[in-house]
């Protein structure tokens, strides 16, 4: 088994294949695992294994996603591939599979198609930081001028959506040829992975980012003070460090962490991913509640107005049966709590149908800790009717 070779000391990067239906995303995913498996860096996964993507639930939305993992000489990758277009839209908009970079697959036989455009736009909206292009099926195109034309079209489309179209790596190859071990095409898969290694930056580790913990619960411990519990979202907290407490009218609430509790033991520090209780000096239990966040001083501000990119569940997915209109007021579930907000639709849009994805403006009734990229679910009477993420802070 190749699994034993996985070297966890390599930096980890999340990638995914995007692009138009039938342009070869899944075949390329299979080809990458095959070429790397032949070097002992992955487990080979065949097309049908990847294509039969298991259903996953993310914030109440069912998404079909395939996850494969592989390594190159320098990195370890988790790679997502989705069978259907709707799955991509849901995946990218809800951030179910966070991508540090994307491999855009475009068939040389077709050139960019409607979903190519839509996936590039989505990648722009949800902030996929980097991309590499694989021009697939070039073995089926005899005319080199046609290949140049398709490359030009791809570059123009990328530039139109504010990606570096002029400089982005475009590798011309054949996923099927690579999968069938034809040396000429295997080389193009290797070239692609070199580009992915070089062009997609390693994301900053969660522990290197400024400390933030959403509050889940608050207790009062006699003689010790107030303890707020939650899962540390990012960063590191050490006993003795100062923090800000933000959201729901917590104005300039500051404190010092006098202890970090984990599994009933008092520790000196907690880091991203830990479920902890933070002992807070000089804070009344009444002044802090679920949904607030505790963070590194000055790192996050409370906001009440933002733009978001959302996916609205279809009726079949358990969403609304009817469209919603301007000034619709659902709850936005952010981190650990619901906040009511009013939705403003883009000019010229009268209503939003179940199954749509759209950019909206939201005014929340309370200011909470918000930042670009924060994900949320949209709920109505406790059931999820949509999901999305913050794309811009307005106020």
UniProtKB/Swiss-Prot annotation:
Residues 81-84 are annotated as: G3. The keyword Ribonucleoprotein does not apply. The keyword Hydrolase applies. It is found in: Cytoplasm. Residues 10-205 form the tr-type G domain. It is an enzyme of class 3 (hydrolase). It comes from the Bacteria. Keywords: Cytoplasm, Elongation factor, GTP-binding, Hydrolase, Magnesium, Metal-binding, Nucleotide-binding, Protein biosynthesis. It catalyses: GTP + H2O = GDP + phosphate + H(+). Residues 19-26 are annotated as: G1. InterPro entries: EF-Tu_GTP-bd, EF-Tu_GTPase, EFTu-like_2, EFTU_2, G_TR_CS, P-loop_NTPase, Small_GTP-bd, T_Tr_GTP-bd_dom. GO terms for cellular component: cytosol. Disulfide bonds: none annotated. Residues 174-176 are annotated as: G5. Mg(2+) binds at residue 26. GO terms for molecular function: GTP binding; GTPase activity; translation elongation factor activity. GTP binds at residues 19-26, 81-85, 136-139. Residues 136-139 are annotated as: G4. Its EC number is 3.6.5.3. GTP hydrolase that promotes the GTP-dependent binding of aminoacyl-tRNA to the A-site of ribosomes during protein biosynthesis. HAMAP family: EF_Tu_B (MF_00118_B). PANTHER family: ELONGATION FACTOR TU, MITOCHONDRIAL (PTHR43721:SF22), ELONGATION FACTOR TU-RELATED (PTHR43721). Belongs to the TRAFAC class translation factor GTPase superfamily. Classic translation factor GTPase family. EF-Tu/EF-1A subfamily. This is Elongation factor Tu. It comes from Cytophaga hutchinsonii (strain ATCC 33406 / DSM 1761 / CIP 103989 / NBRC 15051 / NCIMB 9469 / D465). The gene is tuf.
């Amino acid at each position: 088994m190749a699994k034993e070779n996985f070297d966890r000391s390599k930096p980890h990067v999340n990638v995914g294949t995007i692009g138009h239906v039938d342009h070869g995303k899944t075949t390329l995913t299979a080809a990458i695992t095959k070429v790397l498996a032949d070097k002992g860096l992955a487990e080979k996964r065949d097309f049908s294994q990847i294509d039969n993507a298991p259903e996953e639930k993310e914030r109440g939305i069912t998404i079909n996603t395939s996850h494969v993992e592989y390594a190159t000489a320098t990195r370890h990758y988790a790679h997502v591939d989705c069978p259907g277009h709707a799955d991509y839209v849901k995946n990218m908009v809800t951030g179910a599979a966070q991508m540090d970079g994307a491999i855009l697959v475009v068939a040389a036989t077709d050139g960019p198609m409607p979903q190519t455009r839509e996936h590039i736009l989505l990648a722009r909206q949800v902030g996929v930081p980097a991309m590499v292009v694989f021009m697939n099926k070039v073995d089926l195109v005899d005319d080199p001028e046609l290949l140049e034309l398709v490359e030009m079209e791809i570059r123009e489309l990328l530039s139109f959506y504010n990606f570096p179209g002029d400089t982005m790596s475009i590798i011309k190859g054949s996923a099927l040829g690579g999968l069938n071990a034809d040396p000429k095409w295997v080389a193009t898969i290797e070239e692609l992975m070199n580009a992915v290694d070089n062009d997609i930056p390693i994301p900053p580790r969660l522990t290197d980012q400024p400390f933030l913990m959403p509050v889940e619960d608050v207790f009062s411990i006699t003689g010790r003070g107030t303890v707020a519990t939650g899962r540390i979202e990012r960063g590191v907290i050490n006993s003795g460090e100062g923090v800000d407490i933000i959201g729901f009218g917590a104005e300039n609430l500051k404190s010092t962490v006098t202890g970090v509790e984990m599994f009933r033991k008092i520790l000196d520090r907690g880091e991203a991913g830990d479920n902890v209780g933070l002992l807070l000096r000089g804070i009344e239990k009444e002044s802090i509640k679920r949904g607030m966040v505790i963070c590194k001083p000055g790192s996050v501000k409370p906001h009440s107005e933002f733009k978001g990119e959302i996916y609205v569940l279809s009726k079949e997915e358990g969403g609304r049966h009817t469209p919603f209109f301007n000034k619709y007021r659902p709850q936005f579930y952010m981190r650990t709590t619901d906040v009511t907000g009013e939705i403003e639709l883009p000019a010229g849009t009268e209503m939003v149908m179940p199954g749509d994805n759209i950019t909206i403006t939201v005014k929340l009734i309370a200011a909470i800790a918000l930042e670009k990229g924060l994900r949320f679910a949209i709920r109505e009477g406790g059931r999820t009717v949509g999901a999305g993420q913050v794309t811009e802070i307005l106020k």
